[in-house]
Every structure is written in structure tokens, then in C-alpha cells.
Amino acid sequence: MIRKQTNIKNKKLALDFKPSMTALSRIMQTMIENGSECKTKLSLDANLNYARLVRHIVWLEKKGLVESKVEDNKINVVLTENGKTFASTISGISQ
């Protein structure tokens, strides 16, 4: 079985997409608390619609704040070092 590697350049995002600060805050807070997770579990834990979560994850990937990694046959979303800084900043603002 040949597995295609996902490339951030291939991921599409609407040009007029503006991320919700509330959604970003929920995603970041959940990732700080739970570490790397697959998108389905992350959407459940952050209490966000899956499609909405995916749009925000693509935006975060394009900004270099998260990256997708294959772990245990699952694609998990992981915070980068810049993402950890952003997460602590946005979590402090939302509280």
C-alpha cells in the first residue's frame, strides 16, 4: 500500500477565511491540556464542529503553529514551538 504524504502547500483555504478567536482559543487550550490528538478527538474535546476545526487547523498549519504527524497509524495534530508560544498567549487573553 502506497501512502501519500500530506503537504501543506496542497491544502486549500478560502482566501476570505478569518479565524474565530473563540475557536482558536478552544483548539489551543485543548492541545495544551491533551497534547497531540487526531482531528476527530480534537473536535470533540474542543467542542467544535469537525469542518470548522479543520479550517482552523489548516490556517494554523499555514502559519507554522501546528503540524500534522503520523503517530500509531493516525494523523495527529501537534503544536510547534511557535504554536506553544501562541497557545499560551491566546489562552491568557481569553481568560
Q: Which sequence ranges carry the predicted segments?
A:
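Short acidic, hydrophobic short linear motifs in intrinsically disordered regions
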Residues: S36-D45
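Basic, amphipathic "hinge/linker" alpha-helix immediately C-terminal to the N-terminal HTH DNA-binding motif
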Residues: N73-S88
